[in-house]
């Protein structure tokens, strides 16, 4: 199959920054990572995106908004700059790049209402860089009755090819999702498991002014409040079978209010771990290995709690020889290539769509 140079861009619901990756891939089994960079958002940009998301969630459906348009313009400019810096560091000319997979920023995800909203101007990016851009990768799936998430399973399948199954890949971003890959061809199940870093980050920002709990140190000093944890886990969403997906705002830190800063961090961290354990009940068989990607793998307190809750030792994705910080961005580069080739990026077992479906909108310079 034809190999392409592809850039992938990811800005997650944790609002920590932009991940940009350059890979060579055929959209199937060939993947060669070339370069990666991560650019953190300044506090002002983070707040602008947070306000845009809060506004979007108040709408019944996506509609024009000056505040959201301004956030989109800022976001697009930042992503264009990230691509230029990535290519300069890799000594790759724009003309050598076949496509950019531009996820954009999710500001509202409402598949139950038939829509999902990722801001990011793909046409403006294509003009600015002179490179084809594929964006809006989730909307086609939602329009076809799918959840629109998670999308990374198609990339997880490629990364774990050749491993003895079943294997699970757990992505700990703002929201957590799990991909289960069985021993047989086509055995692919994926769904959101619950909040991951999102609630912990919100708590830390409110209680300490820090955007996250570095190395889980704050949670490690606290004590889990079992009553609060039990109340948070008493939610029918965790019993619902997959496919299912979440908006980052579907759960809040409200139940932890009144706890000390450390105890709240410990309780919310335990909540993430316990929801991962609950998710394993929905899998056809326990995974032999639990591979962990996303920022949450840098939190040793969370990783220990996941091990205790699941009785499986979680392994950072680096155990496979991959850069766990780059996985999501690489995945969207991979999906952009598949989109150009008309190949599926979502499946009945991952989003609930009726049949394997491609996605994305292509913008030419």
Swiss-Prot record:
ATP binds at residues 12-19. Keywords: ATP-binding, Carbohydrate metabolism, Kinase, Nucleotide-binding, Transferase. Coiled coil: none annotated. Pfam families: AnmK (PF03702). GO terms for molecular function: ATP binding; kinase activity; phosphotransferase activity, alcohol group as acceptor. HAMAP family: AnhMurNAc_kinase. Belongs to the anhydro-N-acetylmuramic acid kinase family. This is Anhydro-N-acetylmuramic acid kinase. The lineage of its organism: Bacteria, Pseudomonadati, Pseudomonadota, Alphaproteobacteria, Sphingomonadales.
């Amino acid at each position: 199959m034809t190999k392409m140079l592809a850039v992938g861009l990811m800005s997650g619901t944790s609002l920590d920054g932009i991940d940009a990756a350059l890979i060579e891939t055929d959209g199937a089994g060939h993947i060669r990572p070339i370069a990666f960079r991560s650019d953190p958002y300044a506090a002002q940009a983070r707040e602008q995106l947070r306000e845009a998301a809060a506004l979007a969630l108040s709408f019944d459906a996506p509609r024009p908004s000056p505040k959201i348009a301004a956030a989109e313009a800022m976001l697009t400019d930042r992503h264009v700059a990230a691509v230029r810096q990535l290519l300069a560091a890799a000594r790759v000319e724009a003309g050598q790049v076949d496509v950019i997979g531009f996820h954009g920023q999710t500001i509202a995800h409402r598949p139950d209402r038939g829509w999902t909203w990722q801001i990011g101007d793909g046409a403006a990016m294509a003009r600015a860089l002179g490179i084809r851009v594929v964006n809006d990768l989730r909307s086609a799936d939602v329009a076809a009755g799918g959840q629109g998430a998670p999308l990374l399973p198609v990339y997880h399948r490629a990364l774990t090819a050749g491993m003895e199954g079943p294997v699970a890949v757990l992505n700990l971003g703002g929201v957590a999702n799990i991909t289960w890959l069985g021993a047989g061809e086509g055995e692919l199940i994926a769904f959101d498991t619950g909040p991951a870093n999102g609630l912990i980050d919100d708590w830390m920002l409110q209680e300490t002014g820090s955007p996250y709990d570095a190395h889980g140190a704050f949670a490690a000093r606290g004590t889990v409040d079992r009553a609060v944890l039990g109340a948070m886990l008493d939610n029918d969403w965790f019993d619902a079978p997959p496919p299912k997906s979440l908006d980052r705002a579907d759960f809040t830190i409200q139940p932890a209010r009144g706890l000390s800063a450390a105890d709240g961090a410990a309780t919310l961290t335990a909540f993430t771990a316990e929801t991962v354990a609950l998710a394993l009940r929905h899998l056809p068989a326990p995974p032999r290995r639990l591979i962990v990607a996303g920022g949450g793998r840098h939190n040793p307190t969370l990783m220990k709690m996941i091990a205790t809750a699941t009785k499986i030792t979680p392994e950072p994705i680096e155990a496979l020889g991959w850069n766990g910080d780059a996985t999501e961005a690489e995945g969207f580069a991979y999906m952009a290539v598949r989109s150009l080739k008309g190949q599926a990026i979502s499946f009945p077992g991952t989003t609930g769509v009726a049949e394997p479906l491609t996605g994305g909108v292509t913008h030419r310079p």
